[in-house]
């Protein structure tokens, strides 16, 4: 998150537009991989913010690898999410309005290797047994995908 951290040095905690990507990674049982984040103690999808010169698919692949140890062999674009429901205020006070490109991944390789500085736990969940503590800006994404999957 170098670019955003550099901006924070100039603008402080004021709201920023933060473009990024995340990944709905599904196992063979159609369970979704979620990570328990250390910064806000909520579950969410692997993902992060765009760095200078990256495209959104590159962000999705990079963040998946960094946070989980898994390599996406194929990504399928799902949707772009933005708007007031994607506003988030981090526990330390930084505010963002997220613009998130979400990708689906069912083909991947590697073994779990969580990024110790950001991730407490990695776990697959069935869509009928999702944890209650999901990161607020990611909940609408997960619900949207669940609705598309089961309708």
Give the location of each predicted region:
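Active-site-adjacent beta-strand/loop module that shapes the phosphate/pyrophosphate-binding cleft
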Residues: 81-111
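Conserved Nudix-box catalytic region and its N-terminal flanking loop in Nudix hydrolases
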Residues: 27-67
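Nudix hydrolase/Nudix homology domain
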Residues: 41-43, 111-151
């Amino acid at each position: 998150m170098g670019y955003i951290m550099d901006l924070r040095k100039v603008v402080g905690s004021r709201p920023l537009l933060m473009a990024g990507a995340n990944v709905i990674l599904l196992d063979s049982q159609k369970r979704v991989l979620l990570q328990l984040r250390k910064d806000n103690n909520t579950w969410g999808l692997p993902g992060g913010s765009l760095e200078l010169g990256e495209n959104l698919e590159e962000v999705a692949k990079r963040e998946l690898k960094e946070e989980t140890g898994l390599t996406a062999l194929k990504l399928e674009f799902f949707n772009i999410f933005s708007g007031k429901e994607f506003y988030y205020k981090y526990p330390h006070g930084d505010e963002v309005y997220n613009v998130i490109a979400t990708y689906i991944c069912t083909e991947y390789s590697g073994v779990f290797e969580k990024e110790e500085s950001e991730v407490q736990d990695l776990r697959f969940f069935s869509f009928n047994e999702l944890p209650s503590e999901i990161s607020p800006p990611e909940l609408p994404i997960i619900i949207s995908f669940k609705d598309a999957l089961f309708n």
